[in-house]
Amino acid sequence: MKKILFIGLLSLGTSWAQPKERKLVWQEEFDGVTLNEKDWNFELGDGCPNICGWGNNEKQIYTKDNHSFKNGNLVINVLKNGNDNYTSTRITTAGKKEFQYGRMEVRAKIPTGKGIWPAFWMLGSNIKKVGWPKCGEIDILEYVGREPHKIFTSLHTQDSHGNTINTKKTQIDNIEEGFHLYAIDWTKDKIEFFVDNQSVYTFNPDKKDENVWPFNQPFYFIINVAVGGNFGGHDIDTGIFPQEFLIDYIRVYQ
């Protein structure tokens, strides 16, 4: 998730085709009625006492109650409960499903409105040992309602002191309409980001030491919706709630 942001607009680039040698190795279709806790963990509360506001001055409290399943989708329900009190859900695959290299993709429909901040992202599995940002972070999808029609794709590393300098924001006029496919193609040399199979950003540094390239280890998935915060924006439109983040599926090819 973001702290300081240096950005550039990027037009959609080349399209993507799955290499023939890759196979589907894991999928989460969200076709059940409960979350599969063999693969998923809940992260609860407001981040306190260690990282209050989840490190970004976010307003929401995460609960197990703010999710449901509808028409084969996971639904994260973002609610306003009284004055300046918001609830949401955050889930991870830490310690259960972790992956190194391949194509990771999610099909999702984002919530909208000023103050909303949905994300599908990954953290290095060694985070408890080395901390953030040395563990590395891959933001496959981030959207903030204060900047409509734009998607953010980013990386965080020790070299950037956690700041989001390895990033692009891409204008997609219909991104708030219906479902879209967000993906990365991750190899030992590069990470390329895609929206609806169109390339939007590639990170391929010449230097690949542990501070620049912590992406040579397994990472785990995180799905959440934050409210407000340093990146989501402190000017929250209280009239937009409730909001829903719909996730159809996640698939990993290697």
Task: List each model region and its residues.
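Bacterial Sec-dependent N-terminal signal peptides
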Residues: M1-K20
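GH16 jelly-roll
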Residues: Q18-Q254
